[in-house]
From Swiss-Prot:
Name of this protein: UPF0162 protein PA3419
Source superkingdom: Bacteria
Family, as annotated: Belongs to the UPF0162 family.
Amino acid sequence: MDPRQACLDCLAQEPPALFEAALWIAAEHLPAYSPAHALRELDELVRQIGASLDDRASASERAQGLLRRMSEQGFCEDDDFPLQPRSALLPLVLQRRQGQPLSLALVAMELARRLDIPLVGVNFPGRFLLRVPQADHLLDPATGRRLYTPDCRELLLRLQGPKSELQAAYLKQASPGEILQRLSRNLRQLHSAAGEPLAALKDAQRVIELGPVGAADHEARAGLYRQLDCPQAERYDLERALLLSDDPTEQLRLGQRLGELAPPTSRALH
């Protein structure tokens, strides 16, 4: 089965099969790893963690307990520097029990789904978070720590700088498509930093295929096409980025990049 199509098919299910879709994203880069094998690994985790949770506790307490049990099982944030793509490829995250916060959150959300714990993802800037619907706090997927509004404001300042302001949009539930886009952006960045432009291009194309994107996503793909010496494809993405941008400074920069490209070639007619 084509991994990209399998991912899209999982996303189209009702409800979407988010974790399996993320496994198919990994399969584009790790053909030797079967999504079915990773799902069996998760079955064992469900048995181990589920047996230790208190069914009488509230949803918030069970969700936090789940994250703590994951930590006891060895799951933690990957502290490699620089980070490698393996921190966002779920089969390797399950194998190593280390990953980016989003990767850990995907494992937690699937465990929660199987254990009937309501747990959703939150596209917080700079760090993916979790929440139980209607709870008055968020949860850090790597530590299980509760984050109340002042904690979220402090985290945002640390991640985004002193001029950043907490917005309601930063705290809302992320859709499955948005989560897979964020995972794909993470992989695009990690593969690019690791000097793997072809792998990064797969991720860049998937970002655009999964849903609405902005100028930055087209510009990122244009940069990969430049590395791979594909000037016509680079031109297309720069033009799309210019069309989508509403920032005058960014528009000027994109226009300069377009001007550096050789003009499109056309066949002479005879």
